[in-house]
Amino acid sequence: MLTYFPWFFVSVLLSFAACASAFVGTPVSIRASLKPSMVTMSASDSMGSLSRSDAIKTAAATAAAAGFVFSNSFPAMADGPYILPDLPYPYEALEPYIDAATMKFHHDKHHAAYVANANKAMAGKTAPSLLELQKDAIKAGTRNAGGGHYNHCLFWNTLCNHDSSGSPSPALAKAIDEAFGSMDEMKAQFATTAAGVFGSGWAWLGCTKDGKLAITGTPNQDNPLMDGAACTAMVPILGLDVWEHAYYLKYQNRRPEYITAFWNVVNWAVVSENYEMYASQGKGVPVVG
């Protein structure tokens, strides 16, 4: 399931590029006006779709050349119980490891579509918290949209500017050493899992029921909190989005390079808190959304 890049937006940007030469030197900014509902869902995110990938790159380049304004994200006006929260940092905060264009499209379009679809799925029903929704996400629509919303909220919260990345807390560092032998070995196993996710999905570091750290991968927008997920059951404290839209603008088909870069922007203070306050006690990590 993928929230595909809005094709109408692509065509607008490409049309604008054709006219841009007539306005050289003129300050121009473009503000995306698509509603989240205009972003469609699909069951796969093929890396081999060159025409779509090229269009994504071309549109992003056009936006940058035209002076696209990458301002801070904003919370979406919710048409239901769930909202799109602000990013906890500017779009460009993760540069050069994750680019501003990717962050803007990923948050404002892809994540927003999951929020919109989660609200549609819960229309007329008593909506649980986003964390509780993960445990009850049985139906495909609820599972995909609710999982996509929770996964992205956790993802954004565990990232930060490289200068603020820090290190795991003593408690988390000890748990990592006990489970994997070393930090480097944990990263190596995580990278293998993330690179091995077929098509679209996530890689997770989390705490199992026996209190030990483990690594697992999930397809689509599943996560280890969900009943019936094809993965190791655990409370995730850190996740990496390996859907194509999370990295293609900058890394194209070089997923391993994206995975390596990811470690430069992990917010270890937040991940440590996720472990100590929640996962190590068997509690799911709550998120605002």
Which stretches of residues belong to each language-model region?
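N-terminal chloroplast transit peptides
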Residues: 1-45
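N-terminal targeting pre-sequences for secretion and organelle import
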Residues: 253-289
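An amphipathic alpha-helical core segment
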Residues: 192-252, 258-266
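N-terminal secretory signal peptides and thylakoid transit peptides that target proteins
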Residues: 44-62
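Short His/Asp/Glu-rich catalytic/ion-coordination signatures at enzyme active sites or charged loops
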Residues: 86-110
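C-terminal segment of classical bacterial N-terminal signal peptides
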Residues: 14-19, 67-75
